[in-house]
Amino acid sequence: MTLDNYNIFNDEYLFNMPLSPLPKVLGSFEAQSVLTLTTPTLTPTTTRNIEDTIGHLLSDTQADRGAGCAGFAVPKVLPNAMGAIEALGMGIPSGVTTIPIQTSYDMSLAQASESEDSNASYNDMQMNEEQDTTDTSSAHTDSTSYQTGHIMAGSVNGGGANNFTNVLAAVNSSRGVASAGSSNANTSNTPARRGGGRRPNRSTNMTPEEEQKRAVRRERNKQAAARCRKRRVDQTNELTEEVEQLEKRGDAMRKEIEALTNSKSELEYLLIAHRSTCQKIRSDMLSVNTCNGLIAPTGLLSAGSNGSGASSHHNHNSNDSSNGTITGMDATLNSTGRSNSPLDLKPSANIESLMLHIKDEPLDSTIDSGSSLDQNGPPPSKRVTLPPMSTMPHMSTLMTPTGASSGSLQTPITSTAPVAFGSAFPVTTNGSSINCITINSISNNNMNSPTLNALNKVPKERPNTLAFQRPMAQMHLTLPNNKAGGPTQIQGVPIQTPSTGTFNFDSLMDGGTGLTPVSGPLVPNSSSTNKHPLELPTPTAEPSKLVSL
């Protein structure tokens, strides 16, 4: 047996039923929990309450209840509803009879089926009333007024325009009467609350101290919630500002990338267009001209090659290549001598013009006392080109001074100097006068090798004689009273140093080293006739200094 047998949802009711929202329709069938305006969506708690309500309405299926065995109380059909149906011109279908009015059954069925839920519904209504007395929120007010039936007030008298609403009001009134009649004896029993929901605002067994603590706790929770909301808002604002800054930075970087890409494209285009010209310039720059081992411009190549003559030799293993080019790191050069050194591209002057600027300096008339006699020390810093051998004499006569009164000094000393040394430095002494050392002037036209490399390749010979000069070249050394002995006066000035005398064998042995001065002038004897010492001048030309031969 279904609900259609009672003709509740037939055509006459469906067409006359107004378009009401679903929460209002469902809220008319239960009194325990309803959908309030504060919870417009279906939650698990409200869904369970709805299921419990529908389950209680449809749970009674006993056969002895007759027409009301489905648990649904048949509403009363009012006369004004039937009149409205006839006025609308909708006839009753042929298979549908008039709806029986079962007033006595409604009361008994409601009392028998709803007696078990009376206590729970009464307690829930009491708690809702307590919340309404303490809370001032509009949600509780709306839910309470909706639950007590204030919304549907006045809809019963609406005539035939709202017939289905009248039916629901009749059902609600019958349930309210049944619950009110059966709940007077069971008010002392307070069962546990069913379902979820908010905790009641006021408790009957709470002391004032506990109420004060609850108020303080609620105030503290409100402040904490406000701080949390403020912190969340601040964090959201900070994140929003950071996102905006990052977006601006990203836009700037994208613009910079576009600018760099454009610059790269332009540079690549310029390189491609310049590549053909760059190869020719590079080949011209890496070709270097040389003249006798020195890098020179192209115009001086022929002049340097002609001036060198036969002394310019082509050497494949040295840097003195005269073919005009050298080979470096690139294949355009022809020699490998400068491969590991950087190229010197400075232009150099002509070799002939360089030789004209060399100044002729005479050889020093005195020999440095710090230099060794056998020329074992470092070479001197000054280098003078030797003249040709044919223009210089091969002999130089070295004679000791002789006097008319000194017969022991009449033996001439003649020595032959080597060709390379004596021809370049002729030394001659006659009588008491000593000529200075002369040096022949060197002419640039007599040079066979105009290059510096050729000058360095001339072989050198070691000298085996010593060029010297008397410190007093124009002075006469005279003996007083024409007696035999060493000179003791120079132009009437007596000499007080012991270096004026000669050292004989006995004085050298007795003196120890020969450098020890002896008292008084020594007169040369017969054994020291041919052993006249050669005095060497010092840089200060002082005769008082002792020099050992």
From Swiss-Prot:
It comes from the Eukaryota. The modification Phosphoserine is found at residue 341. Residues 177-193, 304-324 have a biased composition (Low complexity). It is found in: Nucleus. GO terms for molecular function: DNA binding; DNA-binding transcription factor activity, RNA polymerase II-specific; RNA polymerase II cis-regulatory region sequence-specific DNA binding. SUPFAM superfamilies: Leucine zipper domain. Residues 332-342, 366-375 have a biased composition (Polar residues). GO terms for cellular component: nucleus. Keywords: Activator, DNA-binding, Nucleus, Phosphoprotein, Transcription, Transcription regulation. Homodimer. Heterodimer with Jra. The kay-Jra heterodimer binds more stably to the AP-1 site than either of the two proteins alone. PANTHER family: ACTIVATING TRANSCRIPTION FACTOR 3-RELATED, FOS TRANSCRIPTION FACTOR-RELATED. Developmentally regulated transcription factor AP-1 binds and recognizes the enhancer DNA sequence: 5'-TGA[CG]TCA-3'. May play a role in the function or determination of a particular subset of cells in the developing embryo. It is able to carry out its function either independently of or in conjunction with Jra. Belongs to the bZIP family. Fos subfamily. This is Transcription factor kayak. The gene is kay.
